[in-house]
């Protein structure tokens, strides 16, 4: 259908609506939203502004635009023709103003200058070219009033003027200008699709009322109302922040390989071919191989002299050694640097240590436990005082003498596999490695070597996965039972046994404590104040398995504080996620969480749990009225920064509450005016039917 036919259709009012305003206030996008039903994402709205004008010939070219121009307002059929204009002040717009029925004057609520130009430039121009045409004042880009301006400014073009919080105009500013000029006032947001119909429907009403004054004989215009009030826009609740878990750190594979090369805290010494010495750690070997697990467990259950287990002796030796290495309290009070023990003192100390533990003195032959009948790969095992090659400290070690058939090179490769769970496909001596794996009954390694030799290395992935699962389960078992432990943490409400090698490879804080020159590195008991057993158990579970195993009695804030103290950001994030899940579950079941969230807020901020703090801020702000009514004192006791955040991000916002009050007040006033007007019309209608007494 041709656009000109709308002018010929009976009882169809064609309305020419001219849209004017400064550049970049959103005129063209407002027109496209009405004429083309265009929806835009925030990214498109924030793209670089290019001055454009929506062509009026779209009504002739595009059938869809023509169909959308037709509407019914107050039982009057209309065809709305929108005219876009340039925002440059020096442009000549007299042709656009010609024969206009209504003018929509736009400004941006994020640009105070555009509102100033309404009074200084645009309104005088409109009254100059079309003095009798009704005008509608429209505040565009309403969504910027509640948007995250920092994110908005980051998304805009680099050289764009940043939008400041002080640039955002409250609704009363636009309403004051509209009242001063005697204009109806509306606000719109193309992003939220709010106010578009309000603006153009009421622009049509204003045009039809003006036309009714001139064409009073048109009866279908009698029902047209004056421009209606616009209900205020309630911004949507911001979605709760999602707790993001950073990439999980590796299971200490590289650190374990490094620990094998630099055997700090080593407690096992392998002697190969009577000359090659290789230091290792029981916990890594026992959790990776059932053969070594049985070997070291047998050592703990049986001692050479039949009195007490070797595992208990090792703890005593480390305590005694720690007392030797610690500085004497009397010497600490003396000025000057601490004295280093002389050679004769070391000799005396080591002798005392040996005697205290019942171990063989230097030069004596230690009692060896024969292993040839137990396994053909081993000769014997005994306890002996040895000097650690890294820390240069003497301590008890399990000395294992291997069979002559065990070659040093393949045996080192086997140990590296037990530490890391990885096998290099380019290993040179695969045959020797396979032989040692067969002798030591490590069948998974034997199978992996066979796959590599058969060019089927891809099959090793499943074997490696099963290896790590078995190792993780064995580590959990050793942690829960304290098997092969070499350190005990003394806590406020108990003690927990742990393993220094695993801690060194899993936590830099622990590595610094046990691997440095601190006195804890030589002690088997470490006192950690202000820590409870449940939280420490959760931390150790995480360090051993890289997973959080929450307990019903676990306090998330205590765990976060401990994880932050140990410099474990991944565990902090897991604890934050657990805390949010527990709070959400409680809220879903109808339990009030407002007080708990308030108590979490500043503790989370203090312990660097920024994601949990952001979630708490969001909950408080989106439920501000209910939280404030129940916990007013707690709200007021928060820091100034938090209170400022509450005021800025509370929902519903203050400006909405003010607008809602104004809307309800004006609505009541209009209803009273309409009632009074209807009474007046009713009296005028019936006054002609009253009979006069004189006539009667």
Swiss-Prot record:
UniProt-listed Pfam families: BTB, Ras
Tissue spec. comment: Ubiquitous, with highest levels in skeletal muscle, placenta, testis, stomach, and kidney, followed by uterus and adrenal gland. Expressed in a variety of fetal tissues.
Residues noted as binding GTP in the record, renumbered to the chain: 21-28, 84-88, 140-143
InterPro entries: BTB/POZ_dom, P-loop_NTPase, SKP1/BTB/POZ_sf, Small_GTPase, Small_GTPase_Rho
One Gene Ontology molecular-function label: GTP binding
Positions of the BTB domain: 266-427, 485-552
Biological processes annotated in GO: actin filament organization; cortical cytoskeleton organization; establishment or maintenance of cell polarity; regulation of actin cytoskeleton organization; regulation of cell shape; signal transduction; small GTPase-mediated signal transduction
Region listing for Disordered, in residue ranges: 327-348
Keywords: GTP-binding, Nucleotide-binding, Repeat
Chain segments carrying region Rho-like: 1-210
Cellular component, GO, one term: cytoskeleton
Protein family (similarity comment): Belongs to the small GTPase superfamily. Rho family.
PANTHER family, alphabetized: RHO FAMILY GTPASE
Name of the protein: Rho-related BTB domain-containing protein 1
Provenance organism: Homo sapiens
Gene behind this protein: RHOBTB1
